[in-house]
């Protein structure tokens, strides 16, 4: 079984991903969605989080072999970045969404030297906006960002466009299309639900309005 399918299956099993085509969730961005992904739940399942860390480490070795530092995004990316940096025997930093308003006022915590090559660890990619803020902060600090490694992506056109425009490479363990196929095969959703799930991805901003 592929990594994509294995991770999708695990996320469904531990209920890190909820699929409710008939009772959509509302994201913080206001988008109505038949899916909600909370990868923080992986923290409570040692076998799942270990598999995710090992798989992310392998992806990084394959795609970003020159990496010097692993950077987690606050807060959900931090634990995964810690486990991955351990496996790769690399330093780790983490990046806040904005600089602290007290203390040293740091946006990046941990030692980072100009010119170091960094890979950003994310738990989830939706529109890509928050991930790119982390990339920008690292670049402003003088780092060279090789790319982003994430557990899951919705694969939305808006996110793809933002990443392409910023010339940021993204590698993920699994994705929306793979996950809904696994969900159908494992009877988490019906064939009718699948039509709704596929329709949402075509135009999430207007779906459900």
From Swiss-Prot:
Entry keywords, A to Z:
Glycosyltransferase, Magnesium, Pyrimidine biosynthesis, Transferase
Listed pathway(s): Pyrimidine metabolism; UMP biosynthesis via de novo pathway; UMP from orotate: step 1/2
User: What is this protein's record name?
Assistant: Orotate phosphoribosyltransferase
Q: Where along the sequence do coiled-coil regions lie?
A: none
Tell me what reaction this enzyme catalyses. orotidine 5'-phosphate + diphosphate = orotate + 5-phospho-alpha-D-ribose 1-diphosphate
Q: Where is the signal peptide?
A: none
Gene of this entry: pyrE
Family matches, as Pfam families? Pribosyltran
Q: How does it assemble?
A: Homodimer.
């Amino acid at each position: 079984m592929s990594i994509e399918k294995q991770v999708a299956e695990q996320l469904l099993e531990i209920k890190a991903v909820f699929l409710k085509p008939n009772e959509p969730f509302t994201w913080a961005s206001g988008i109505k969605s038949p899916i909600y992904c909370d990868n923080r739940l992986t923290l409570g399942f040692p076998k799942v989080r270990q598999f995710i860390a090992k798989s992310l480490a392998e992806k990084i070795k394959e795609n970003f072999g020159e990496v010097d530092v692993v950077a987690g995004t606050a807060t959900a990316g931090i634990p995964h970045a810690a486990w991955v940096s351990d496996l790769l025997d690399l330093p780790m930093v983490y990046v806040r969404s904005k600089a602290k308003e007290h203390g040293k006022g740091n946006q990046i915590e941990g030692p980072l030297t100009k010119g170091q090559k960094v890979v950003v660890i994310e738990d989830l990619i939706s529109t890509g906006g928050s991930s790119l803020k982390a990339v920008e902060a690292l670049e402003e600090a003088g780092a060279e960002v090789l790319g982003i490694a994430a557990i899951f992506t919705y694969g939305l056109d808006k996110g793809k466009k933002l990443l392409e425009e910023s010339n940021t490479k993204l590698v993920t363990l699994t994705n929306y299309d793979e996950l809904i196929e696994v969900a159908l095969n494992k009877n988490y959703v019906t064939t009718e639900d699948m039509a709704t799930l596929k329709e949402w991805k075509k135009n999430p901003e207007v779906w459900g309005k």
